[in-house]
Amino acid sequence: MSVMLMHIHLPHMNVNNSHISKAQVKWVRSLQMKKHRDEQGVFVAEGEKCVNDLRQSFELLMHITPDNASSTEIEQMSSLRTPQGIIGVFRKREDQVPSPAVLADGQLLLALDGIQDPGNLGTIIRTCDWFGIYDIICTNDTADCYNPKVVQATMGALARVRVHYVNSLPKLLEQFQTAGYPVYGTLLDGKNMYVPTAIPTKEKGIIVMGNEGNGISEDVRKLVTHSLLIPSYPVNTPTSESLNVSIATAIVLAEFRRQHNKKS
């Protein structure tokens, strides 16, 4: 099996080689850095399932297997402690940021305000895939969705969930708010989300989740129309300061879907 490589032009590279070259190994390894991923417009995924899922939605540029690379070379290119033996290099996808005009009935969007941890972002993407949220809007200081750790944590969900980065999340939220869509935010002074009136019957809207340490930024907080709280149990008893943001996201999305199913 030959190394698949299309449209990417690298020096001293013979695409007809049956075995991966040193230049290719070095190039794939360099894609662990965001700078090089952005310059080339590509990203790396590992593992048979993840690669197979992603090739349904992304253009596969390079497919590396034990047939065309040694275990040492795969280890050099891998970002995992225990390489899975299959590596794919994909071209990034250009998706249009959703607008109020194209938001379908029953469609929810998720907005992430400064999520820093790649593992959290990857888990959130995977959670959105489970709960039928297919667009995530991120501030530019949110972790890169093409970071190898994020891609790995999504377990292939990146093939079905579109992740968008915007220069101004407040500006985008204003557009949705003006169009009459609710903007939900998880805040410590929010309303217990398990109270029936906390989540309106209108299913359209944007759910905002904030930074791991600081929560939702002040500029975004001002645009939240429905403040929600995930209560501790028993309510109002001393407990941990906060939930992990990926766990909190899963709880919120599960409750939205539960209430929507109950009302429909």
Residue ranges and their predicted role:
Residues 185-240:
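Active-site/ligand-binding-proximal alpha/beta "capping" segment
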Residues 41, 112-116, 233-241:
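Short pre-catalytic strand/loop immediately N-terminal to key active-site residues, enriched for Gly-Thr
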Residues 130, 145, 152-157, 218, ...:
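Structured adenosyl-cofactor binding patch, chiefly the S-adenosyl-L-methionine
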Residues 7-64:
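Boundary-proximal intrinsically disordered activation/regulatory segments immediately upstream
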Residues 72-90:
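Glycine/small-residue-rich loop that forms an oxyanion/phosphate-binding "nest" at active or ligand-binding sites
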Residues 1-6:
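Methionine residue identity
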Residues 101-190:
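RNA substrate-binding interface of SAM-dependent RNA methyltransferases
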